[in-house]
Amino acid sequence: MPLRRFSPGLKAQFAFGMVFLFVQPDASAADISAQQIGGVIIPQAFSQALQDGMSVPLYIHLAGSQGRQDDQRIGSAFIWLDDGQLRIRKIQLEESEDNASVSEQTRQQLMTLANAPFNEALTIPLTDNAQLDLSLRQLLLQLVVKREALGTVLRSRSEDIGQSSVNTLSSNLSYNFGVYNNQLRNGGSNTSSYLSLNNVTALREHHVVLDGSLYGIGSGQQDSELYKAMYERDFAGHRFAGGMLDTWNLQSLGPMTAISAGKIYGLSWGNQASSTIFDSSQSATPVIAFLPAAGEVHLTRDGRLLSVQNFTMGNHEVDTRGLPYGIYDVEVEVIVNGRVISKRTQRVNKLFSRGRGVGAPLAWQIWGGSFHMDRWSENGKKTRPAKESWLAGASTSGSLSTFSWAATGYGYDNQAVGETRLTLPLGVAINVNLQNMLASDSSWSNIASISATLPGGFSSLWVNQEKTRIGNQLRRSDADNRAIGGTLNLNSLWSKLGTFSISYNDDRRYNSHYYTADYYQSVYSGTFGSLGLRAGIQRYNNGDSSANTGKYIALDLSLPLGNWFSAGMTHQNGYTMANLSARKQFDEGTIRTVGANLSRAISGDTGDDKTLSGGAYAQFDARYASGTLNVNSAADGYINTNLTANGSVGWQGKNIAASGRTDGNAGVIFDTGLENDGQISAKINGRIFPLNGKRNYLPLSPYGRYEVELQNSKNSLDSYDIVSGRKSHLTLYPGNVAVIEPEVKQMVTVSGRIRAEDGTLLANARINNHIGRTRTDENGEFVMDVDKKYPTIDFRYSGNKTCEVALELNQARGAVWVGDVVCSGLSSWAAVTQTGEENES
């Protein structure tokens, strides 16, 4: 039958008719026009409503539970009366992270119900472990399940960030500027400079990236280079890109070590997308807890409580993001109403992996286009000219438990290349990495590394080896090297000992050897600071040349308030030098760090080197740029000076602002309208950022969700009332620049004494300003908050007459005493007749 709306009139009749519902029919009920369903007398009005059809809530109820306090709503059902038979037309399930879940079999039974009739007990059996029970008295439907019919509420391992919050054209420009000057020993000098620019312009999720640099600015050898000009759309788990980029910026799921330097003009498509966030911090093996009612789950390891979490009734996966990494057992304890219901041991499997996380789908990417290969040379022996070629390939990656892998197959210049990368943690102690390459010109490469933490937790060891043989086509060099190293933490054996590290590198192709040994020990750590001892030795052999050995020993002193000093000696190039270093850090201001170092030869033959050398540096963080200025006089007599600065500019419509930060290529412009050096703070995902003056730009990482809250700054005397725009929720893609324009009132707490023009005090008078009112005391004194944009106080008397006080608050901050002020327009307070509300505005 066609579905009809339950009209307001019928709702009223139904509400009235419910009063006459009875469990047992009696004689009087039989006389009226009524119907009995499931032992319940249905009045005529309610029967008509049921024939029209109505929606009732659907709750899940655990069999054997007393009462309905732990029932959870999981959807709704549409019921109707058909020729005296009560039926379910359909069921609509409502998904919720907090709700219990039903098994897939039970879910399918619910979704396929169509015109299913209730039996005389108002029940519809679904499976051996689940049935539907209808209560006409409460007008609700219960899904009564045994534990076997419950599903498990698993935690999502991935999530799409959704649509962009910025629906207009916007842009982010990042800049990096550097100037270098070398003053030679003979008086000559040379200067070089560069300016790198990265611009991302976006419309919602679509963006265009331009990346390039200018070199030798202001010199006769000026040059420029464009590294990337590309359109990209990364949305809902898929990424498309097209344009030009150099091979240094090539993005691939798998290794691509056989690609030579050059530029690629092509397209790329795949599901390796930043718009989908994968959570790899959960245990690979889910930790599951069953709760018969709402309660708590306690996780304990070796008697130590790790986590307490609250859940509703059902099977739930416990959140393991905050647990330590490793493979270990935890005791899962379920507590309901203060009583321990169950206790069992489960395994946590959390290991670092390079994949997208457990449960992530297979990642893939296809790409291709035209490849301009740059001229290539190997030590002047082999030379290949620049060349144009085709390029096509595919990449894929995945994981199985803690094992992750990646593979790439591609071709160019009539060569086929295949590469793989494998990562396998062997328990908590050992991690193995393998990377291989094989090409059709008989080129091959193998890179293997193993890292291990030895038993006891006081030492670690790593081994790397690379061997590469190149055929007659690929533009790469042979390689044959190995390295081994380790760290021994002697603190675990005796607290007064330190940490010893050693490494050895052997490049057999160039017949060079290099080893280092370092020792660090904390001598003192307390209220007055910390003192540490460093010592080490390094030795380098290159081919047939004699060995070069260097030694050092130093004491590092760190003091409170950001002070650091170091004193020591080094021996290298046949002579010994004494070294002094100092550094000071600042929490506020433009200059954040200043430092200096000084070295003097104290023994041995310095040859042509100077006996005294040193340098100084400063790190700055200004409104529009941040960077470093460094001046250094080396032992060879050269004086090197360099300046680096970077920052960002954000633009959207009429709004443009700059920042000395380069946190990302998206951001937010705050148009606060604050005068002079006014300051408030922006709290973004828990981090606090200062906002100064009328307009600020804060660059942020793209592909992120941000919760932004404006608040008063703890470092400012000013008080602001943020009337609107206090909180915002943003989703930003590359190039997205959001604009937040809050209504901000700068508040000043003003106190003083108000007089009429003849000097008489306005005692017990109601005075007003732009945002509020107050009453003076018997001495005419008052205290009230005033908006600095409207620095006036007025007093209304004798009907429509008004006097006004103009306050001078330009320099006022926080609270101010203005002393005696005159209300212009009121000749005398004595002449005012106080009658009720006469003096109220």
Swiss-Prot record:
- Please tell me whether the keyword Signal is annotated for this protein: yes
Q: Which domain of life is it from?
A: Bacteria
- Kindly summarize what the UniProt induction comment says about this protein's expression: Negatively regulated by H-NS. Positively regulated by IHF and EcpR.
Q: Which UniProt keywords apply?
A: Fimbrium biogenesis, Signal, Transport
SUPFAM superfamilies given in the database record: Carboxypeptidase regulatory domain-like
Residues making up the signal peptide according to the UniProt record: 1-29
Q: Which family does it belong to?
A: Belongs to the EcpC/MatD family.
Q: According to its UniProt entry, what is the function of this protein? A: Part of the ecpRABCDE operon, which encodes the E.coli common pilus (ECP). ECP is found in both commensal and pathogenic strains and plays a dual role in early-stage biofilm development and host cell recognition.
Q: What is this protein called?
A: Probable outer membrane usher protein EcpC
Q: Which organism is it from?
A: Escherichia coli O127:H6 (strain E2348/69 / EPEC)
